[in-house]
């Protein structure tokens, strides 16, 4: 009976040590996975920054837009449609992005992947927020990139935008999506005991 008790206590000790070892390995793996995700997200943000700058600096369609146009300026409709399509494609490349947009301050026009909105257009709450917010920020420093946290209808976003002249290019990233991705990095790892020598 004493030998059985000793064997059971040795086995329990071995299981406890192996569980702790396994837990340490899982924690290390989760930590490294999260670090990798953050590193990838940072690289994606760097790519998006370059894309926003290129939209205003070297995009032919954006450069073809006149300084002022309105909802009755039919000559710019093909250009606006081309820009909308380019913004739609930009959003497809980045899973985390809610959407790309361009804002033309002189015309108070917001170009998104779904079309162009003017001051009297019917807009979603997000489009309405962007038009008001960006219009109010047109006096900020030119040729600059901005990152700001904004709240739109009970949801927090990372609003990134680049301004040149009276034009702004930017995107919205829901913070909830970032947090969900981080949380998913830590799920699915169970701790199974193994015999440790």
Regions inferred by a protein language model and the residue ranges of each:
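Short, flexible, glycine/charge-rich loop motifs used to bind or transfer phosphoryl groups or to couple energy/partner
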Residues: 89-91, 136-138, 159, 182-184
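Extreme N-terminal signal-anchor transmembrane helix of membrane signaling/transducer proteins, especially
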Residues: 1-24, 28
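A structural signal for short coil/turn segments at secondary-structure junctions
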Residues: 94-95, 186-189
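An N-terminal domain-start capping segment
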Residues: 6-14, 117-118, 125, 142-158
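Membrane-proximal, non-catalytic sensory/regulatory domains of signal-transducing membrane proteins
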Residues: 132-164, 190-197
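Extracytoplasmic/periplasmic sensory segments of membrane signal-transduction proteins
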Residues: 28-40, 44-133
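Conserved beta-strands of PAS-like sensory domains
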Residues: 112, 120-131, 151-186
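Conserved hydrophobic/aromatic positions in well-ordered beta-strands
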Residues: 101-103, 171, 194
